[in-house]
Amino acid sequence: MNFGKKIFDFATEIFHINRSITGEGVRQTLTAISKHIPKLEIKSVSSNTKVFDWVVPKEWKVNEAYIITPKGDKICDFNENNLHLMGYSIPFKGSLNLNELKNNLYTQEDQPTAIPYITSYYKERWGFCISKNQYDKLENGMYKVVVDTKLFDGVLNYGELKIKGKRKKEIFLSTYICHPSMANNELSGPTVLTFLAKWLELCEDLEFSYRIIFIPETIGSITYLSLNLEEMKENIIAGFNVSCVGDERAYSYLPSRNGNTISDQVALHVLKWIDNNFKKYSWLDRGSDERQYCAPGIDLPISTICRIKYGIYPEYHTSLDNLGDVVTAEGLNGGYWAIRRAIEAIEKNKKFKVQVLCEPQMSKRGLYPTLSKKDTYDKVKLMMDFISVCDGKNSLLNIADLLNIPIWELYELANKLESYNIISTRE
């Protein structure tokens, strides 16, 4: 089934919201997500709350921001493109000459048509982001600058969804909701995860429980960990950071710090069979919330599956990261299925033990074909090869690797053999 168009339409719906690490844009985004997953809980943590080595920052609100040129033209209008205003800009109103103004203008020199994405969360300043082409056309004279913003003691918001399975042990899925109008680096993660959550809520026989969060990057994951660490360390057995999953350029894998968790094994297996040319990165290439989840002392078994990795593609952190050119419906569908395949693999990754000594007699159970066809040999060989490694020690993922076959091509076979009591599940 292709979910790409539905995910793309949802991304289009929330693209223009001004998201940051705090503020109304985060709440608007979470509210939009909750329309798809009504059980999502929107939570808040007060500014100035100590979270490990950090402090929850003040909340940021933008009313308007723009520049009036000497000729009276309005440029860098926040209402036209929210990337024009540097994130967390402090208030400013005044008139500046061109040289003074340039101290507060930011461009992307190598991409003259792009508006760069710039933030200053932890040092108070104001600024505007402008394309190099527009910057080069600025004329001498006096410019009127309006930055109508407010920093105040408020809250940091995040969304949390818990889905109960047969076991208390959890699979953890995390994405961020703190960037303004950018498609792959921002919206691909939360929109894909929204639809994965919708699917999981409809599953009636989940083996594991699920902890799914939508957070501001870095400060959000630090805050969430500070509030939930003991429970997370006790229960989480696998998980994925969901980021940059909307383009068609590549598939990518970023390992956990140790690189040997079930999340790593599953990610490598799934990507091998989806795209054998996938890009494999090292822990040293980390850059998103896996930095916190896999930090020493936290040590959660979290890896990352991307399409093209954040920081790698040229449109990253600019206005060129858009819906249509970078993020497509087909790209989002590919990202969705890569992570869904990984989740399903963890759910199905049981150990099986054959229940008879020597090879079982398949014909008396009606499992051996009586008519020889072109593909008969391959089907029988796969079945017998599968049984031959069901020793109670090999997991289904191990078996798939031994047989050099995608794990999802073994689900039906395992169920059938178990239903005939030829194999049984081992914990």
Region roles according to the model:
Residues 1-427:
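N-terminal hydrophobic/helix-forming segments and targeting peptides
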